[in-house]
Structure formats: structure tokens, C-alpha cells
Amino acid sequence: MRHVLSLVYKCSVFSKQVTVFSNHLRLSHSQQWGSNKLHRKIKIPNPFREIIMADPKIEEILAPLRANVKEQGDLVRKLKEEKAPEIDIKKAVAELKTRKKILEDKELSLAPAEDLFDRAKMEDLIKRRFFYDQSFAIYGGITGQFDFGPMGCALKSNMIHLWKKFFILQEQMLEVECSILTPEPVLKASGHVERFADLMTKDIKTGECFRLDHLIKGHLEKIKSDKNTKIELKAEIEDILIKLDGMNADEMSALMKRFEMKSPISGNDLTPPIEFNLMFNTQIGPSGLVKGFLRPETAQGIFVNFKRLLEFNQGRLPFAAAQIGNSFRNEISPRSGLLRVREFTMCEIEHFCDVKEHPKFESVKNTQSLLYSADNQEQGKPADLTTIGDAVCKGIVNNETLGYFMARIHMYMLAVGIDPKRLRFRQHMGNEMAHYACDCWDAECLSSYGWIECVGCADRSAYDLTQHTKATGIRLAAEKKLPAPKQIEVVEAIANNGRIGKAFKKDSQAINDTLATLDNAALEEMQKELDSNGEYTLITARGEFKLTPSLVNVKKTQKTIHVEEIIPSVIEPSFGVGRILYCILEHNFRMREGDEQRTYFSLPPTVAPMKCVVLPLSGNAEFQPFVRDLSQELITVDVSHKVDDSSGSIGRRYARTDELGVPYAVTVDFDTIKEPHTVTLRERDSMRQVRLPMADVPTVVRDLSNSKILWSDVEQKYPKFEQQETVKGTSV
């Protein structure tokens, strides 16, 4: 971990010197609907806000725009405090987004640009070396589905292995593997059946579907880019695009009619907007009677197993459960490679706790991160570089447990190769919060596609356990020992089981289970209804049933308790492996200075697909025993590697392994044959080499790959390699 800690330290020191310019990346050209965007270079803005702030003339231009955003942000807060009508709040939020976008665009236009990023070259390298490619390509491919090749699989596997060490091992989490097929009642209770949907429209003749917001955006951007479009209309379109995310079905439908939108593929008319649930539905079993879905997240499997996990943990809180697996979302129009797909791997943690202090918070409180709070977004301010400890102390981050996991996420992202200058945490604003969350921060990475959400860290409170308790009648709760016994008033439903059994037969169990879950408020409401109306309608998982005083009554008693029942809160870090993997590749894509055709990935050794390559200098038969011995010794110490004894110059073979992101290369040459047997070890990024005893190679490469030592340590210990002393058995 030495390399990782060094990187974190360097990031922390470096970050103190700059304030990062946190804007939403905007591509240099509009993305045309359905166009091939591969063959173009993309201008990535300089992420440093310090450059802008240092120029008073630039800040003078931005000051009134910041004031406009702050003014509107204050109005939004005021409307919320006054509990104004929802429509008024929505309009105010839409206007706030408009002003934010104007400010961000102006900041972006004033910021100096970094070098052009050649996405085409990177994607060519990814495809040519088979990191990943479109699934079923020989049949034309399926949009939003990808197959990982040998290098992609190894990179992904190493990322997950490091994730397990960072979280499961370090925090002693309970790992589970739950079913992908999920019965409908589970996802009804969680809210996914009702709320997990996007608006779409269809080609009335071909039936081809389009995600509505993407269709509108593509159509309007095409009009906007037309040189014949009037300035007034361009300005109006810009305003519409900014407000698009907050529009409902009626507003989008009006835009379709006004701009006479047709299918971008066929030119045919389109249907009115319809809601499309993003979950893949299926039938479980041959009868077709059991409806199910492919899970949209791995979390629900953990929640429904809460009682078993709590029991495994001897009934104690806090504890965390983790799961790694695939989830599925039937995206209407997947795009942007691995960033929006229909099948993806997630690493999710559910941390169950009753108090939100964390025992390890002290160890991470000085971690510096770039935080883009909801308040800063509303005020038109940039993200702040601050410590997690200060953020929790000031109430920017809700609690210690949430802050602890944000710090650990930050460290993990740096360890796998994310550029610290292009990493931030952005807090969800109230209008974009998921239905289950009371606070949420996304770890976002800046890429050529913009700021990409890669990790969500949500405070789900007790939402999920409460919902599943209501749906099943089974208490998903923990017991907490009280420091001293206390007297409480207990309100409970006393059921006449005999009469309920005769009256409702097979439904009697569902009735009794539901009665057991009613809280005091519901029981008091029941008593009120029974007294005034002579009956009470009980809603259960099997339907509604009318109960009378002869079947049930409500009783209040005094009771001494030694423990209290609590439904724990949940902090959920959720990692999108594919998105992180893509950002790692983009952040580590390099071109050799002076030779742009020599591209490679500067991946950290910890996650590199292979740790080293063994290369004989030529096809000389004398090299083969040494190559075999080296390979076997590397296998013995668990170092993944390959032997490249193909024809071609040593330089060409170095370049080939650099493309794969292999950090080290061991070369067997004529000096190896002599005693003592030595080889050269080459480092990928610097291309520098040292000469070391052949027997040292396995241990050195293993320790480099595990970040126990750095390349600088190796250079200090072993002599620099200039040239071999022997050529075909003759000393130079």
C-alpha cells in the first residue's frame, strides 16, 4: 500500500496549491443524434479554477452571473421553507438550473484548454487489444452490451480484488451472493416497480423506440447548429435544453408538436410520450404465474436477508454486508460505450447502524476531497477543497459514517488510477434525490463525456427495511440493550384467532402477521374506527379485510423493557465497475512524446492486467531455459505475466506490451547466459531499465505489483542498464 499512500499524500499536498474548477464538461461539438462520434478529437477544459480566479478581469465578468445564481438559489430555499405549491418550486428550480448552466458555460469558455484528447485513438487501442468490444459483433452487435476480452477481464478482476481488500477485508464486512431473478413483490415494496421509469416514444411504423429526452435534445441541437437558425430561436433552444431534465410528459409532448419531431432514423411520425419501466421483466417457472424481474440493483438481496445477517453477527449493530454482481436496466437508448449499458457489474455495500458516528472516522478525517455541495450548486459557487472532518463538522456531509465511506471511496479511486485532479463528490439536490435516499453524494470523474457518476454514496435511512417489513409482516429490526430497564406504554392488537380463522380461513395468517406490524399510531386509528364505525379495514399483502370488535380489539398496558427495538439506518456506497473502468482507461491513456502513434495505458501496477512480460532478446535457443525458469518462478509467487518470444525487434515487443498496460518487462539477453545470471527490468512509463540478478526478479516484481516498493527504490538498489556487455557469446 506504500504506493497508494504516497499517491494520496501527493494528491493532498498538490490539492492545497490549487482550487479545482468544477464545471460540467461540455464537448466541443454537439453530439448529433445517431452520428458516429468516434473519429474526432475532444477538447477537455483545464480543471483548475485558480487560473480563472487569478485574473481579476475574468472574475469581474463572472461576478454578476454568480450573483444571479445566488439570487435564484435563495428564492428556491425560501419557497421550500414556506411550503409553496410544488409547481412554483419546480419553476424556480428550472430557472436556477438555467442560471447555473449560463455560469458554467461562461466559466468553461474563459478557462484555458488542456491538450486535445484523442478518443478515437484510445477506442482503437481498446478494440484492437480486446479490452472490450460490442457483444455479438459478428451478428451486427447489440447496443448497450459489451464483452470483456482477456485484458478487460483481468483489469476488472484486479479492480474488484482491490475493492475487496479496501472494503470487505478492511471493514470485516459480510459478503453475500443473492439471486439475480427477483419476484415482483420485492421490487414493488422497494418502489422500483412504480418509480423506475423513463419517458419514451415510438416510430409508429417500425416500432423503433427512442428515449424522449435524448430525442428532443438531439433534434434541438441539430436546429441550433444550423447556420440559418435565428439568434432568438437559438437562445430559446438553449434555455429549453437546460430545463429539459425537469420537464414532464405534457411539456415534452408540446415540444415534439411545436418542432414537428419525426423519427431520426426513418422520418416517420412518433407516438405520444409513454412511461417505460427500465427493469427487464420475466416469468419465473413454466406456469407463467410468478412474475419477476432481473434485479436493477444488488441491494434488495441484502435487505431481504437482513435478519439472517443480523443473527450471523450475533445480533449486534453496526455491521456491513457487501455484494458483487451484475444488475440490469433496460435502457431505452444506451450510448457512450461502457457509461450507459443494459447489463453492468456493481459492488455494493449496505452498512447497517443505529447511530451514525463511526469508530474509524478519526483515521480519515484529514482526507481532502473536492466537495460540490447542493448549497454551492444553488449559490453558483464552485466546489470546495476541504477535509472530510471539516465537512462533517460544518454539516455539509450529514454524518460521520457517510463521511467515512466518502473518504474511503476517495482513497480507492486514487488507488485504481483515477486522476485526483478529475475527481469530485457532488451532492444531490433535493429535486434529484432517489426515492429511497435522504442524502446522497456521487463520486464523479471528469472524462471526455463530461462529469460521470461512478460511485453513489447514499444515506437510505430506514426506508428499505421499513418497506419490506410493511410488505411481508416480518419485523426487520434489531434489539438494542438499554442501560437501565424502563416502563413503557404498550399498545397492541388482541386478535381472536379462532374467529379470525373461521371467518377468513387461508387469509388468517396474513391478517395476524399484519396486525403484529402495526405501530402505535395505526393501532390507535384502528381503535377509533372500531369505536365509531364498528369495523376497521385492514390492508394486507393478500388484500383488504374488514375487522369487527368481535375479531380484534386494542389494549394498552404498562410494560418493563430491557431492550428496545430499532430499525437501523443504512449507508450505501454503490460502485459502477464499468464506469470506473472506463474512466481509469481514459485517465491513463498516453501517447509517447514525439511519436503519437505509440499509445499505451499507464495503469497502476496494482490493477494492471498483467504485472510483467518476459522477453528473450531473440530466438536464440540458449535463452529458452532461462525464460522457462523465470516464468515458473513468477507463477510460484503469484505474479501474472506472459512470455513474448515472438519474432520482431525488442523495441516493437516493448511497445506491444505497453499497449496492454503491462508495467514491467524482463529481458533475457546474452549477459544472462554468463554467471552470475542477470536480466534487465524495464519500467513502462519512464522506459528506464536496471540490471539485477535473475533470482531477485520474482520478489521484486511481486513487491512492485503489490505497492510494497516503488520503482525509485529499485533504481536505488540496482545499477542502471545502459547496454549489454556480451553479444552472441563475445564480450563488448
Swiss-Prot record:
Gene coding for it: GlyRS
Lineage: Eukaryota, Metazoa, Ecdysozoa, Arthropoda, Hexapoda
The enzyme's E.C. designation: 6.1.1.14, 2.7.7.-
Binding positions for glycine per the UniProt entry: 297, 348, 572-574
Annotated organelle transit peptide span: 1-27
Superkingdom of origin organism: Eukaryota
PROSITE patterns: AA_TRNA_LIGASE_II, WHEP_TRS_1, WHEP_TRS_2
Species the sequence originates in: Bombyx mori (Silk moth)
Protein name as catalogued: Glycine--tRNA ligase
Coiled coil: none
